[in-house]
């Protein structure tokens, strides 16, 4: 399945796979976690419970919105999986989540006033899970940016259109390029994940990763993903990626999380597969969404980076900290 109105960049690709029920599938690792497995995890004992209780670590936040008032190419983690990016003067927000979620308290303040997120050209939504696709945050973005274009995966338009009014929504299949007319190129690529917002919509909306390509810079945003060959494929399709944004948290217990979230060691391997110049980790420290302590992803990532001799290429940033792309 794909969007016939969009260009497919991989000539051999036959379209995003679906099962007999019309549900999207991971092409390398078909299948998804069952509701029974989710219940099992919910009620089983967390072996790291006491360690989590004793963990006093909190991510520091940089409350400086100066990056909003410059013209430089920049990447800014705003917490969890939310990014502000500027490339060639075009401003983008990825997976905006500004506050608490219905089942998760936010542990880090949002680093800027949301009212200042104006002049946004594109809003990218990697998938439909609540910690990436937040109704309240999207309504704020839309109200302040009536001309912003929303870019997402197949099946997302019906959901987003309820919240973003008459703003344009484009939905893509994997290996498809969105229709933009300003010189910026944005592509939707595979990720190893799943989607669900309600009991009856499992994998009805496509998940994925993004590649953003300007005249001078290329950025990869991995969304939520387990480890797989799609990282190597992204590096081959887009050689010379400058920055890879890769999730490193919500990976424990492995028996349950492995298909959907890589652990920090696998994130380093993914970075090596992509062959990017720099990695910025995300998806940790803001919400408590798994068994591991909030501090653990960063600790393990640092050790894995040292062991893989990529310590100086992995940039651990604070929410609100601007990374200027020279």
Walk through the language-model features, giving the residues of each.
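Acidic/histidine-rich helix-loop elements
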Residues: 96-110, 194-201, 252-261, 288
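Tryptophan-centric aromatic hotspots in well-structured domains and transmembrane helices
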Residues: 77, 150, 171-177, 207-210, ...
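Catalytic core of the metallo-beta-lactamase
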Residues: 84-86, 179-242, 258, 262-265
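Cap/insert and terminal regions of metallo-dependent hydrolase folds
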Residues: 3-4, 12-13, 19, 24-27, ...
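Active-site HxH/HxHxD metal-binding segment of metal-dependent hydrolases
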Residues: 99-101, 105, 110-178, 190-195
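Metallo-beta-lactamase
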Residues: 1-102, 113-116, 153-221, 242-249, 300-321, 325, ...
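Redox-cofactor binding/interface segments in oxidoreductases and associated redox assembly factors
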Residues: 95, 125, 187, 246, ...
């Amino acid at each position: 399945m794909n969007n016939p109105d969009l260009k497919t960049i991989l000539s051999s690709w036959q379209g995003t796979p679906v099962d007999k029920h019309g549900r999207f599938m991971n092409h390398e690792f078909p299948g998804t976690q069952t509701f029974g497995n989710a219940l099992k995890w919910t009620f089983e004992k967390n072996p790291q419970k006491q360690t989590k209780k004793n963990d006093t670590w909190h991510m520091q936040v940089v409350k400086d919105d100066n990056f909003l008032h410059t013209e430089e190419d920049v990447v800014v983690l705003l917490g969890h999986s939310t990014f502000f990016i500027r490339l060639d003067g075009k401003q983008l927000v990825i997976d905006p989540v500004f506050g608490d979620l219905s089942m998760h308290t936010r542990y880090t303040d949002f680093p800027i006033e949301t009212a200042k997120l104006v002049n946004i050209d594109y809003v990218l939504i990697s998938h439909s899970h609540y910690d990436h696709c937040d109704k309240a945050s999207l309504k704020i973005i839309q109200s302040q940016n009536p001309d912003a274009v929303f870019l997402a995966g197949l099946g997302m338009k019906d959901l987003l259109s309820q919240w973003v009014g008459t703003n344009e929504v484009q939905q893509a299949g994997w290996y498809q390029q969105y229709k933009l007319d300003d010189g910026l190129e944005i592509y939707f690529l595979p990720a190893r994940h799943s989607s669900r917002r309600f009991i009856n919509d499992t994998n009805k909306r496509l998940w994925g990763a993004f590649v953003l390509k300007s005249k001078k810079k290329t950025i990869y945003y991995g969304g939520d993903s387990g480890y797989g060959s799609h990282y190597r494929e992204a590096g081959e399709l887009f050689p010379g990626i400058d920055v890879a944004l890769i999730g490193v948290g919500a990976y424990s217990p492995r028996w349950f999380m492995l298909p959907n979230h890589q652990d920090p060691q696998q994130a380093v391997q993914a970075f090596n597969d992509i062959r990017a110049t720099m990695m910025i980790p995300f998806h940790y420290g803001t919400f408590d969404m798994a068994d591991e302590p909030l501090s653990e992803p960063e600790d393990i990532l640092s050790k894995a980076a040292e062991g893989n001799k990529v310590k100086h290429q992995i940039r651990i940033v604070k929410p609100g900290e601007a990374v200027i792309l020279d």
